[in-house]
Amino acid sequence: NTDDIRNAPAIDIIQSLQQFESIHQKILPHICDLRKLIKDMTERTMICAIYLLFGKMMQTLEVIFLLAKEGRNQEVGELVRSVNENCDLISLFILNSSDEYLNKWFDGEIIEHAKAREAIHKFLNRLNLQDPVSKEELPVYEVSTYIYRVFSKYTHSSYAALLDSVDVFNKDFDFHRFAGYHYIKRNFHIIRKAIVETLLRLISLYLALSDNDNYLKVDNILKEIMPTVTEEEIKNILEKFTQKKR
């Protein structure tokens, strides 16, 4: 029964999204509370820029949840990329003490995503090298570039991404979203990752603001959704990229 093929994953998706929607509602008050730190919504400050980006991200996540319930796999992929880029832009604004990119952003310029990847790479490796056990540079830039390119396939309608929109049952484009529901369920981790990245940026902001109370509160929210990854799994993932650099 073709209806069962579509309805079964749809039910699973709706049930699984309940946790994500609950987490979203826990994050939102923290985002809204940042407004107290802003005198004017047109001020050219880091906190105002980050507040605007967080606001957009929270609304984008709401749309992602709606699209996921409808089996809109392609559109979810495009919007997850948007959340990822906004997260990295927030990191760039926090890490770049000179406000160079912040001022360009307020002037209406588009900040290249590579600039954010470079800043995050340098920061994380600076922390990593403080560990006396660490001997190699972490391939942060390479990993983030790989992820960026994967999601770019959805944005730019690459053939590889559009193959996910082929309905193998009807041998047609996936107008009835049989494939869409299947790929939403299979790729559910990308929605989780978008929420995790949002929480990590909020934690980074609280650290920059020396707001320990809110840092601890958001860290507890993060623990509810953060996937468990073993040290060995992380090592195997990083090894793929360190080998490419050699």
What are these regions (language model features)?
Residues N1-V80, I90, D99-R246:
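A cross-kingdom marker of C-terminal helix-rich interaction/assembly modules
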